[in-house]
């Protein structure tokens, strides 16, 4: 049995869960999220009101999907109650970020500013010219936008310049030594 998959997902007060076959819809104070669970996996509610994810047999694919499905359902519940935030920072001379309306405008050493538009359900906040955060209720969207922004100027292994997650340790390389 999957150790993660067999744990029930607790549903806090103020969260409404609707299960219709393979579709799970979670509505909470921050919004609504939907998920379609893969075919052999079943989702139901137990007597305590918690969400239980079960699998029909112990085939390898079903074992893999069991833990995954439980985690995805848990992420829905966390998203509509607390939301997700990724904090990022910029290192480098002249590298900065500013908020233009609901979009982020980056100066990353290119000949032009780079503008990232906020997709639906994602909000940007700028704490300083070198620190900003990405928030939303969908964990996948927040992570994907964060990765896309980091890819604009990956941290350089020699000088450490670029966009990185807050607290991320960059493996530094030693430069060439002169004679």
Swiss-Prot record:
Alphabetized SUPFAM superfamilies for the sequence: Ribosomal protein L6
Secretion signal span: none
GO BP field: cytoplasmic translation
One Pfam family recorded for the sequence: Ribosomal_L6
Highest rank taxon of the organism: Bacteria
Molecular function in Gene Ontology: rRNA binding; structural constituent of ribosome
Entry-linked InterPro entries: Ribosomal_uL6-like (IPR000702), Ribosomal_uL6-like_a/b-dom_sf (IPR036789), Ribosomal_uL6_a/b-dom (IPR020040), Ribosomal_uL6_bac-type (IPR019906), Ribosomal_uL6_CS (IPR002358)
Keywords linked to the UniProt accession: Ribonucleoprotein, Ribosomal protein, RNA-binding, rRNA-binding
GO CC list: cytosolic large ribosomal subunit
UniProt xrefs under PROSITE patterns: RIBOSOMAL_L6_1
Family stated for the protein in its record: Belongs to the universal ribosomal protein uL6 family.
NCBIfam families in UniProt: L6_bact (TIGR03654)
Function of the protein: This protein binds to the 23S rRNA, and is important in its secondary structure. It is located near the subunit interface in the base of the L7/L12 stalk, and near the tRNA binding site of the peptidyltransferase center.
Subunit structure, as described in the record: Part of the 50S ribosomal subunit.
Protein name: Large ribosomal subunit protein uL6
Organism expressing this protein natively: Mycolicibacterium paratuberculosis (strain ATCC BAA-968 / K-10) (Mycobacterium paratuberculosis)
Organism placement in taxonomy: Bacteria, Bacillati, Actinomycetota, Actinomycetes, Mycobacteriales
